[in-house]
C-alpha cells in the first residue's frame, strides 16, 4: 500500500501510510508475543504428547567450515579505474540514437 501511495501521491502520503502500518503491526505483535512465549513454555514442560512429535524432531545442523582466505567468485571484484569506461565502450554498439524533433537545438 505504501508503495502505491508513493508512486501516486508523493512522499507525505507514503510516510503517513507507512507509519499507520507500523502502528498496526506493532499492535498485532504486542498481543501475540506473550501468547507465543507461554505456549512454548507449556510445551517444554509437558513434553511430547504423541508418538509423531517425538519421531519428527529437527536434525541438528553441523556448522559449515568457511574459508575466508580465498574468494571463490572473483568476477565481481575485479574493478579498476577504467571498468566503467570499458563497459561503456562495449555496450555503445547496442545503443539506439537519441530521437530528434528535426529542429536544431538552441546554442547559447
UniProtKB/Swiss-Prot annotation:
- Residue positions where Phosphoserine is found in the record: 105
Location of the protein in the cell = Mitochondrion inner membrane
Region span, Disordered: 32-67
Organelle transit peptide: 1-35
| UniProtKB keywords | Electron transport, Membrane, Mitochondrion, Mitochondrion inner membrane, Phosphoprotein, Respiratory chain, Transit peptide, Transport
Q: What is its main location?
A: mitochondrion
Its topology with respect to the membrane?
A: Peripheral membrane protein
Ranges annotated as spanning the membrane? none
Could you tell me the superkingdom of the organism this chain comes from?
Eukaryota
Q: Known Pfam families for this protein?
A: NDUFV3
An example GO BP is:
mitochondrial ATP synthesis coupled electron transport
List the GO cellular component terms: mitochondrial inner membrane; respiratory chain complex I
**Subunit annotation:** Complex I is composed of 45 different subunits. This is a component of the flavoprotein-sulfur (FP) fragment of the enzyme.
Q: Which family does it belong to?
A: Belongs to the complex I NDUFV3 subunit family.
Q: What does this protein do?
A: Accessory subunit of the mitochondrial membrane respiratory chain NADH dehydrogenase (Complex I), that is believed not to be involved in catalysis. Complex I functions in the transfer of electrons from NADH to the respiratory chain. The immediate electron acceptor for the enzyme is believed to be ubiquinone. May be the terminally assembled subunit of Complex I.
Q: What is this protein called?
A: NADH dehydrogenase [ubiquinone] flavoprotein 3, mitochondrial
Q: What is the scientific name of the source organism? A: Rattus norvegicus (Rat)
